[in-house]
Amino acid sequence: MPSISTNITLAFTIALTGMLVFRSHLMSSLLCLEGMMLAMFILSILFIMNLHYTVSFIMPILLLVLAACEAAIGLALLVMVSNTYGLDHIQNLNLLQC
């Protein structure tokens, strides 16, 4: 079991590193953020299953719902920025202010 949690933690760390390295493009940042949320989802499932703490089975599902909302808002921003400016650079998000 420690090897699975180590691999998932490594996947989270790689996604976090990708978020820091590829922070200029919105699509790359969204993909790295989704990888981080998926790793957190799997780690929370493993944590709950190891402790046999069945009361908190709702927490990973809540995390998945929040990840879906984050993805929807991120994709809406991506479509708005790419339709307005033709690029998906994060610096263009500052130009969308009223």
Swiss-Prot record:
GO terms for cellular component: mitochondrial inner membrane; respiratory chain complex I. The keyword Transport applies. The chain crosses the membrane at residues 2-22, 29-49, 61-81. It catalyses: a ubiquinone + NADH + 5 H(+)(in) = a ubiquinol + NAD(+) + 4 H(+)(out). Its main location: mitochondrion. GO terms for biological process: ATP synthesis coupled electron transport. It comes from the Eukaryota. It holds the Pfam family Oxidored_q2. Its EC number is 7.1.1.2. Core subunit of respiratory chain NADH dehydrogenase (Complex I) which is composed of 45 different subunits. Core subunit of the mitochondrial membrane respiratory chain NADH dehydrogenase (Complex I) which catalyzes electron transfer from NADH through the respiratory chain, using ubiquinone as an electron acceptor. Part of the enzyme membrane arm which is embedded in the lipid bilayer and involved in proton translocation. This is NADH-ubiquinone oxidoreductase chain 4L.
